[in-house]
UniProtKB/Swiss-Prot annotation:
GO CC terms of this entry: cytoplasm
Domain SH3: 281-347
Keyword terms of this UniProt record: ANK repeat, Cytoplasm, Phosphoprotein, Repeat, SH3 domain
Gene name of the encoded protein: CASKIN2
Superkingdom: Eukaryota
Composition-biased stretches (Polar residues): 415-425, 1135-1151
Record's keyword annotation contains Chloroplast: no
Biased composition annotated in UniProt, kind: Basic and acidic residues: 731-740, 1161-1172
Location of Phosphotyrosine modifications: Y253
Positions with biased composition (Pro residues): 765-774, 913-923, 966-978, 1018-1030, 1052-1068, 1124-1133
Name of the protein in its database record: Caskin-2
């Protein structure tokens, strides 16, 4: 074997001459027929399995390789490691030897014992040309070696950038990135990104990210971020964070990247990585200051003092959701804990740590699904280089319980239109709540847009935070026009915005497509795809960031008269010539543009197309609103004089019934809640949709929840506006914005009241009423006999939305007077107890004609006028009366059941002691709160149960109490213009005292047939029921509006206290008071219908008949001390002096005559209805009740005279 060893030695030494001699001898022996027995073995292998060709390939000598191949050397001979000559040639990276071996048909995909092919070696050592040649000869880059690594893995692991780019540009790039040849369950499974991150190859990582590799792909060790953090690759960590890696992902050891850094590294690089990870994740670390546990709450997080808690999110009730990881036990605990027991350990940059406990801090939406709170920032001018985000201010007046909600938290709040509204702690407005499963609302609730609100309201809101955005970010105000954003600063703004989430590479996509900042805020995922954002991860990230933008409304809120003006408002005046040349030279034609027509015209940029179509859509909305406004104004002239009430019942589960038809809009353009949808969809004109003050991505929950009751805490009584002020300054629901004017007011009228919906009125003529000048009165109508009330059901919220009818077209010759000083807006928040399933399916309550009239639990308020008194009101069986009624919105029989249910007291009816009336106060807006007025010279209550005037009630008025007090719904009158009525619904938010059983027939008779004295004047306080009395229950139906007097000047109708005879205390007031205190609202006392009747007296002014001991008085919370003093009415001439027996007897006779007249009127009404063939069930038992009433009345009058 000497010659073989000589050959190997010659090849190793590169002795080409010696190799040629040895090879020549081999050739010579082949030509002989009888050759030597000792032939030269060219494929001889040494102890390591190396052949001469192995050595030649390893040495890279082309001549030697060629000589050996000519001598018939085996090209794919393997050594002891399974390596072939091509492996060594590729390892050396010499191109020509590889080409020579490949031409000799060397196997390109032959694997060694460790599973490597020549491409593995070339890629590992970065031989670009060799790798390229191997790929050209069909080398498979997806083959894995025994370590489960592909050539791309090796190139990325060792930082071979060019080879990695070569492999990524191959046709098998997707397979390489997806790792199709690998088993994810393999413990050795890895990805090119992990290998590059482990070794800190930033450029390779950048190439992988550009190629679209999944950045959050996990292995046993976690994500690539785990690898970079573990090995201290700070720049790689920063690069991965810029690429959008999820920092909250845990590996199989339940560790995040931050956990790994904290546990295993202590270098300077680790400190930088910690800061980067904390900033990127938005993790809020807190340390427990004391132990906390709650065994009664399974969702509570039990903590010990010193525990480090990771805050995940915040519950709407103010608690924080935290996570405690116990590394020693390897367990995790998640639950809720109060923020007051912890201190901040780590926080995001810019968040004041001192404020976090008082204003709970949610986390970044991209990771924890909760909005990022703002940081305090110094005031600086508005810049366009940063886009605003949605956030919630820690300065929210609602405090730390209601200021921030969690989009993904457990027990998230219900729909804003039908859910709970949180009451602010300082009385300025409700807290901002975030609605679950909705786009993050804008903090634009605090933005006051010019021209849309009265100056006073704008001034009122000016002190509140402008917008809630993160540090260094500003809100674009309404004054920013699109053309201003296009003046060179828009590109910078878009670039900075995209840089915040490391996608600045798409800046050119937005700019080339013609998108500016306002239009980006309206982009959809489809629009992103159209401009070239094709990667799903990037598209999802940008779409989520767009949803968080807070851009003020920029579309024109009016219909321009000129096309150029409209284009300038959109910031696209350059298309004026193209539109005109294409025939779109007027606003009417532009309103019909479509996407296809824009392309035909020459508007090729997608952003410009988007903006033009948004403008066209706005024009269509404005036109539709104008048409609805015209229809509304025409229908308003035919409205019946009587007020119409629409009660919207909210279902207990927060979901309203599905409504057919188009979605209705509020004044701000946001969708109404399901309850309002259901209530308004039944009929009548739709509300006028005005231009929204905010973009759809900024719809405020507060704007859609205004007017909703069902507050979480006991509401405080709203103070009364005692001082005269403009009507538009009346008490609105807290935190609401003023709606813009719908249309010009009717002649002689002030601004329209603040209402949500204008129910359609009747086109017919109004019903005949009493002669002009007749005083206006309350009329409580009797219904069917009171039945034992049902136990209280779960409370449900109702909204009383009413609109007074206009005075135009009245057939009674009413004189229109100035309204601006007397007409005020009214909005009341009430609750109704749950009704039957029928009520749940049809929450709309509106007047309907004839017997099927559903009646709402409210009473109409009308101003009283001077003049001759009206005849006694007739017994009414329906709200409609003789006048035709407008078409009903809903024919549901549900409200009938509610008509016999218990009455509720309105939230805006705090109580006070009863006091005498006086002349009308100066005209001013009526407050939502009803209150009492002190009588002249401290006279006792005019109709109280005793002459002392309930001292305990006056003592209760010295302090302001938030808790409800037993009270009843006293009637109240408000000065309103001619033909305008308001409806006050009553609520069950205040418990009532049980009725005095002995006097129940008396009160029934008095209130039903008008013998009770009149209520005080418009400026006078309301009478209050005594503790032993109870207000009438809801068995009485709605009074007929048209039957009440409609004209005259308000005048005091109740006599002075001097006319009252000495009144003994009512039976058992103390007993009833104690009983009332024990009564828990389990059952409601029986109801008593009532009607207040005015009869003529001896003087020129009407002198109502009064019966003692029938006054409805109640004690309520003290009204707000800010109310100014009210005028003290002077005593009337005919009511001065003492009351003698003769006067008492005269009053008794007058009372008897009035009762007889009322009885005759009732009998006549019954007879008329029976003749018409439409007897009402509510009148069947009237005559039976009257005899009992008279007996009780006679006993009471005798006791009173004694």
């Amino acid at each position: 074997m000497g010659r073989e060893q000589d050959l190997i030695l010659a090849v190793k030494n590169g002795d080409v001459t010696g190799v040629q001699k040895l090879v020549a001898k081999v050739k010579a022996t082949k030509t002989k027929l009888l050759g030597s027995t000792k032939r030269l073995n060219v494929n001889y292998q040494d102890a390591d399995g190396f052949s001469a060709l192995h050595h030649a390939a390893l040495g890279g000598s082309l001549e030697l390789i060629a000589l050996l191949l000519e001598a018939q050397a085996t090209v794919d001979i393997k050594d002891s490691n399974g390596m072939r000559p091509l492996h060594y040639a590729a390892w050396q990276g010499r191109l020509e030897p590889v080409r020579l071996l490949l031409r000799a048909s060397a196997a390109v995909n032959a694997a060694s014992l460790d599973g490597q092919i020549p491409l593995h070696l070339a890629a590992q050592y970065g031989h670009y040309e060799v790798s390229e040649m191997l790929l050209q000869h069909q080398s498979n880059p997806c083959l894995v070696n025994k370590a489960k690594k592909t050539p791309l893995d090796l190139a990325c692991e060792f930082g071979r950038l060019k080879v990695a780019q070569l492999l990524l540009n191959s046709h098998l790039c997707v397979a390489l990135l997806e790792g199709e040849a690998k088993d994810p369950c393999d413990p050795n499974y890895t990805t090119p990104l992990h290998l590059a991150a482990k070794n800190g190859h930033r450029e390779v990582i950048r190439q992988l990210l550009r190629a679209g590799i999944e950045i959050n792909r996990q292995t046993k060790t976690g994500t690539a971020l785990h690898e970079a953090a573990l090995y201290g690759k700070t720049e790689v960590v920063r690069l991965l964070l810029e690429g959008g890696v999820d920092v909250n992902i845990r590996n199989t050891y339940n560790q995040t990247a931050l956990d790994i850094v904290n546990q295993f590294t202590t270098s300077q690089a680790s400190r930088e990585i910690k800061q980067l990870l904390r900033e990127a994740s938005g993790i809020l670390k807190v340390r427990a200051l004391k132990d906390f546990w709650n065994l009664h709450d399974p969702t509570a997080l039990n903590v010990r003092a010193g525990d480090v808690i990771t805050v995940l999110e915040q519950h709407p009730d103010g608690r924080w959701k935290g996570h405690i990881h116990e590394s020693q036990r390897g367990t995790d605990r998640i639950g809720y804990f109060p923020p007051g027991i912890v201190e901040v350990v780590s926080k995001r940059v810019g968040i004041p740590a001192a404020r976090l406990p008082s204003a709970p801090t949610p986390l970044r939406p991209g990771f924890s699904r909760t909005p990022q709170p703002p940081a305090e920032e110094p005031p600086h001018p508005l810049t366009y280089s940063q886009l605003p985000r949605v956030g919630l201010s820690p300065d929210s007046p609602a405090g730390d319980r209601n200021s921030v909600g969690s989009e993904g938290s457990v027990g998230s709040i219900r729909s804003a239109g039908s859910g709970q509204s949180s009451e602010g702690t300082n009385g300025h407005g409700p807290g901002l709540l975030i609605e679950n499963a909705q786009p993050l609302p804008s903090a634009g609730e605090d933005q006051v847009l010019p021209g849309l609100h009265p100056p006073s309201l704008a001034d009122n809101l000016s002190h509140r935070p402008l917008a809630n955005c993160r540090s260094g970010e500003q809100i674009f105000t309404q004054d920013v026009r699109p053309e201003q954003l296009l003046e060179g600063k828009d590109a910078q703004a878009i670039h900075n915005w995209l840089s915040e989430f490391q996608l600045e590479g798409y800046t050119a996509h937005f700019l080339q497509a013609g998108y500016d900042v306002p239009t980006i805020s309206r982009m959809t995922p489809e629009d992103l795809t159209a401009i070239g954002v094709t990667k799903p991860g990037h598209r999802k990230k940008i779409a989520s960031e767009i949803a968080q933008l807070s851009i003020a409304e920029w579309l024109p809120s009016y219909i321009p008269t000129d096309l150029l003006e409209w284009l300038c408002a959109l910031g696209l005046p350059q298309y004026h010539k193209q539109l005109v040349s294409s025939g779109y030279d007027s606003m009417g034609l532009v309103a019909d543009l479509t996407w296809e027509e824009l392309q035909e015209i020459g508007v090729n940029k997608l952003g410009h197309q988007k903006k033009l179509m948004l403008g066209v859509k706005r024009l269509a909305e404005l036109r539709r609103g104008l048409l609805q406004g015209e229809a509304l104004s025409e229908g308003g002239r035919r409205l019946a004089k009587g007020p119409e009430l629409m009660a919207i019942e909210g279902l207990e589960n927060g979901e309203g019934p599905a409504t057919a038809g188009p979605r209705l809009l509020t004044f701000q353009g946001s969708e109404l809640s399901p309850e309002l949808q259901a209530a308004m969809a039944g009929g009548g004109p739709e509300p006028l949709p005005l231009p929204p003050a905010r973009s759809p991505s900024q719809e405020s929950i507060g704007a859609r929840s205004r007017g909703s009751g069902h507050s979480q805490e006991q509401p405080a009584p709203q103070p009364s506006g005692g001082d005269p002020s403009p009507p538009q300054e009346r008490n609105l629901p807290e935190g609401t914005e003023r709606p813009p004017k719908l249309c010009s007011s009717l002649p002689g009228q002030g601004p329209p009241p603040y209402v949500f919906m204008y129910p359609q009125g009747s086109p017919s003529s109004p019903a005949p009423g009493p002669p002009p000048g007749a005083p206006w009165a309350f009329s409580y109508l009797a219904g069917p006999p009171a039945t034992p009330p049902d136990p209280p059901r779960p409370k449900r919220r109702s909204h009383s939305l009413s609109r007074p009818g206009p005075t135009e077209g009245d057939a009674e010759g009413e004189a229109e007077g100035p309204v601006g000083s007397t007409l005020g807006s009214y909005a009341t928040l009430t609750r109704r107890p749950g009704r039957s399933a029928l009520v749940r399916t049809s929450p709309s309550v509106t007047p309907t004609p004839a017997r099927g009239t559903p009646r709402s639990q409210s009473f109409a308020l009308r101003a009283r006028r001077k003049g001759p008194p009206p005849p006694p009101p007739k017994r009414l069986s329906s709200v409609s009366g003789p006048s035709p009624e407008p078409p009903p919105l809903d024919e549901s029989p549900g409200p009938k059941e509610g008509a016999t249910g218990p009455r509720r007291r309105t939230l805006s009816e705090p109580a006070g002691p009863s006091e005498p009336p006086g002349p009308p106060a100066p005209a001013g807006p009526a407050s939502d709160t009803e209150e009492e007025e002190p009588g002249p010279e401290g006279t006792p209550p005019s109709r109280g149960s005793s002459g002392e005037g309930l001292p305990f009630a006056e003592e209760g008025n010295l302090t302001i109490k938030q808790r409800p007090k037993p009270a009843g719904p006293p009637p109240r009158e408000t000065p309103v213009p001619p033909g305008l009525d308001f409806n006050l619904t009553e609520s069950d938010t205040v418990k009532r005292r049980p009725k005095c059983r002995e006097r129940e027939p008396l009160q029934t008779a008095l209130l039903a047939f008008g013998v009770a004295s009149a209520t005080p004047g418009p400026a006078a306080p309301l009478p209050s029921p005594t503790p032993g009395e109870s207000p009438p229950a809801s068995s009485l139906p709605q009074p007929e509006p048209s039957s009440l007097p409609a004209q005259g000047v308000p005048t005091p109708l109740a006599p002075s206290p001097a006319m009252q005879p000495p009144v003994p205390p009512c039976p058992g007031p103390g007993l009833e008071s104690s009983a009332a205190s024990r009564w828990n609202g389990e059952t409601e006392p029986p109801a008593a219908p009532a009607a207040l009747l005015k009869v003529p007296g001896a003087g020129t002014a009407p002198k109502p008949v009064s019966v003692a001991c029938t006054q409805l008085a109640f004690s309520g919370p003290k009204l707000a001390p800010r109310l100014g003093p009210r005028p003290v009415p002077p005593p009337r001439p005919e009511s001065t002096g003492t009351v003698g027996p003769g006067q008492a007897q005269q009053r008794l006779e007058q009372t008897s005559s009035s009762l007889a007249a009322a009885l005759r009127a009732a009998e006549k009404s019954i007879g008329t209805k029976e003749q018409e063939g439409t007897p009402s069930a509510s009148t069947k038992h009237i005559l039976d009740d009257i005899s009992t009433m008279f007996d009780a009345l006679a006993d009471q009058l005798d006791a009173m005279l004694d």
